[in-house]
Amino acid sequence: MMSKQNKKDWKKFKDEHKEEHKVENEILEEETDEESQHQEPALGHPSYTALEEQLTLAEQKAHENWEKSVRALAELENVRRRMEREVANAHKYGVEKLISALLPVVDSLEQALQLADKNSDPSMHEGLELTMKLFLDALQKFDVEQIDPLGQTFDPQQHEAMSMQPAPGAPPNSVITVFQKGYKLSDRVIRPARVIVSTK
């Protein structure tokens, strides 16, 4: 049996130990509270909402960059086509200025041929005719074609009407006189034919 004194000592020991344990628990709770306050959510990672916002921004940026690259490629393709067209036109129409400068020479030869006819000089006429043929053959090698529309229907794309006159027996809107022949380089008119057109 425990004596009174022993009971007292045991009670005192228990109370002291209880108090100590209580203080330790309080300290532990305080430390845990402090740690939880300083700790970021989800072990230091940003929240789901923040990640979602970052993903949306990244997707928008990627879409913008994709659109820019598509536009840049389209522009590059347009530039390539334009350059190809310009090079092709340079090959096709590069001699246009030279041909235009030579056309008055052809006109002069034609006028000389008409005068030679009037003067009835066969040798002069033959020489001019040969020169004219050589000249036109040379122009043909450069894809130059003469427009001589006498009797044809008036075409404003290739003919320039100097005047309109009634012409019995001729269909309306047809070329009845050619003042000056026209010329085409490939499919481009470099000088329209100057003509008189019949009326109704």
Curated annotation (Swiss-Prot):
<dbReference type="GO" id="GO:0051087">
    <property type="term" value="F:protein-folding chaperone binding"/>
</dbReference>
<dbReference type="InterPro" id="IPR009012">
    <property type="entry name" value="GrpE_head"/>
</dbReference>
<dbReference type="Pfam" id="PF01025">
    <property type="entry name" value="GrpE"/>
</dbReference>
<comment type="subunit">
    <text>Homodimer.</text>
</comment>
<keyword id="KW-0143">Chaperone</keyword>
<dbReference type="GO" id="GO:0000774">
    <property type="term" value="F:adenyl-nucleotide exchange factor activity"/>
</dbReference>
<keyword id="KW-0346">Stress response</keyword>
<comment type="similarity">
    <text>Belongs to the GrpE family.</text>
</comment>
<protein>
    <recommendedName>
        <fullName>Protein GrpE</fullName>
    </recommendedName>
</protein>
<dbReference type="InterPro" id="IPR013805">
    <property type="entry name" value="GrpE_coiled_coil"/>
</dbReference>
<dbReference type="GO" id="GO:0006457">
    <property type="term" value="P:protein folding"/>
</dbReference>
<keyword id="KW-0963">Cytoplasm</keyword>
<dbReference type="InterPro" id="IPR000740">
    <property type="entry name" value="GrpE"/>
</dbReference>
<dbReference type="GO" id="GO:0051082">
    <property type="term" value="F:unfolded protein binding"/>
</dbReference>
<feature type="region of interest" description="Disordered">
    <location>
        <begin position="1"/>
        <end position="52"/>
    </location>
</feature>
<comment type="function">
    <text>Participates actively in the response to hyperosmotic and heat shock by preventing the aggregation of stress-denatured proteins, in association with DnaK and GrpE. It is the nucleotide exchange factor for DnaK and may function as a thermosensor. Unfolded proteins bind initially to DnaJ; upon interaction with the DnaJ-bound protein, DnaK hydrolyzes its bound ATP, resulting in the formation of a stable complex. GrpE releases ADP from DnaK; ATP binding to DnaK triggers the release of the substrate protein, thus completing the reaction cycle.</text>
</comment>
<dbReference type="GO" id="GO:0042803">
    <property type="term" value="F:protein homodimerization activity"/>
</dbReference>
<dbReference type="GO" id="GO:0005829">
    <property type="term" value="C:cytosol"/>
</dbReference>
<feature type="compositionally biased region" description="Basic and acidic residues">
    <location>
        <begin position="1"/>
        <end position="25"/>
    </location>
</feature>
